[in-house]
Structure formats: C-alpha cells, structure tokens
UniProtKB/Swiss-Prot annotation:
Keyword ATP-binding: no
Stretch list, region Disordered: 161-188
Protein name in UniProt: RNA pyrophosphohydrolase
Sequence motif Nudix box, residues: 38-59
Family as reported in the entry's similarity comment: Belongs to the Nudix hydrolase family. RppH subfamily.
Function per UniProt: Accelerates the degradation of transcripts by removing pyrophosphate from the 5'-end of triphosphorylated RNA, leading to a more labile monophosphorylated state that can stimulate subsequent ribonuclease cleavage.
Keywords: Hydrolase
Organism: Glaesserella parasuis serovar 5 (strain SH0165)
Source taxonomy: Bacteria, Pseudomonadati, Pseudomonadota, Gammaproteobacteria, Pasteurellales
HAMAP family: Nudix_RppH (MF_00298)
A GO-annotated cellular component: cytoplasm
Keyword presence, Phosphoprotein: no
Gene name of the record: rppH
Length: 200
C-alpha cells in the first residue's frame, strides 16, 4: 500500500526495558541494525499493525508489553535511489511514512523470539543505551530516529519521575507507621540516557 506521494505507510516500534535501554535488532543475514518496523496492511488501523509487527518480528504479544506512547504525526524518510524499485506493475515507492510506538517490556526477556515468521526479519538483538540507535542507524533513517527519540525521551523522563515519586511516598508511609525509622533520603535516580545535543 503506497500513498499518492510514493510513501509506504509503516509503523515503527521502540521497546524499552525498566533500565531505560532499548531493543536493537540485527537484520537477517546483514550487518545492519534497526528498530522493528513494518507496513500497514489494508483494513488495519495503526495500532493493530503495530501489534501484528511486534509479534511477527520479535515474537511479543500485547500482554508482554505496556504501551507508553504513540507519536501523533507521520514521519517520513526517502530511500536512496539505489533502493528505489521501478516496477511497472506497481506504484513506485520512494520511501516510508511512519507512526512510532514506545513500548515497555513487562514480560521476561526470554519471551523475545525472532523465529515466529517463516521469513524472519532479524537474526539477533541486544539491549543498547537510549541514544545509541540515533548514531548507529543507516544515514537515511537518522533524522527520523532523532525526532522519535527526542519525543520518547520526554516520556521516559516522566516515567522515571513517577517511579521516584512512588518510592518516596512508600518511604514516608513506612516512616509514619514506624516512627523510630527516619524517612529515607531522596536519591537521584541514575538517568538511563543522556540528552542528545545534535542538530534538530
């Protein structure tokens, strides 16, 4: 399915763990790494496409993750000319337009399975620091990755603040019940990522 401008509608998926690292996947038979992504089928809405791709590419079901955020706008990248296929029987696809989702893995990482499809997209994966993919992805996707990660960084910062607030609340409640204990000093949580200072 290609739109009138030549872009294929697509979903992209960033999966994080509780330490703020993100899942980085190696494309099958290649020395190329990226986030899971895939096209939207006719009749699917964006969220349905995301959960289908999530299972097909990394073997995770809806129950294995928590949806933290979905980007509100389409982000586009053009393919290099060498990758554009000029097939007379089909419209020419010049690139992808993507909606991105931020998910947190709530299941054990053993649930990740790259072999759920007969034609696997990936043959390896690992956890990497939050900003690592922006520097390492192929150049024509870099601007999209930078925009996505800047948006998602704000979401994860908010999640960390919630965790810190809940810990402080629990400490205060415990101290109130047992007055011989003092409230634990507030500790600054170690940030799982650094602020990217590259070009916008």
């Amino acid at each position: 399915m290609i739109d009138f401008d030549g872009y294929r509608p697509n979903v992209g998926i960033v999966i994080c763990n509780k330490q703020g690292q993100v899942l980085w996947a190696k494309r099958f038979g290649q020395n190329s790494w990226q986030f899971p992504q895939g096209g939207i089928n006719e009749g699917e809405n964006i969220e349905q496409a995301m959960y289908r791709e999530l299972y097909e590419e990394v073997g995770l079901a809806k129950k294995d993750v928590r949806l933290l955020w979905a980007s509100k706008y389409w982000l586009r990248y053009k393919l290099p000319k060498r990758l554009v296929r000029n097939e007379q029987t089909q419209p020419v696809c010049i690139g992808q337009k993507q909606r991105w989702f931020l998910l947190q893995l709530v299941a054990d990482e053993g649930a990740i399975n790259l072999k759920t499809s007969k034609t696997p997209e990936f043959d390896g994966w690992r956890w990497v620091s939050f900003w690592y993919p922006v520097r390492q992805v192929v150049s024509f996707k870099r601007d999209v990755y930078r925009k996505v990660m800047k948006e998602f960084a704000q979401v994860l910062m908010g999640e960390q603040k919630k965790v810190e607030s809940e810990k402080n609340r629990d400490n205060k409640e415990f101290t109130h019940e047992r007055k011989e204990f003092r409230t634990q000093p507030k500790r600054e949580l170690r940030k799982p990522y650094r602020v990217f200072k590259g070009k916008k």
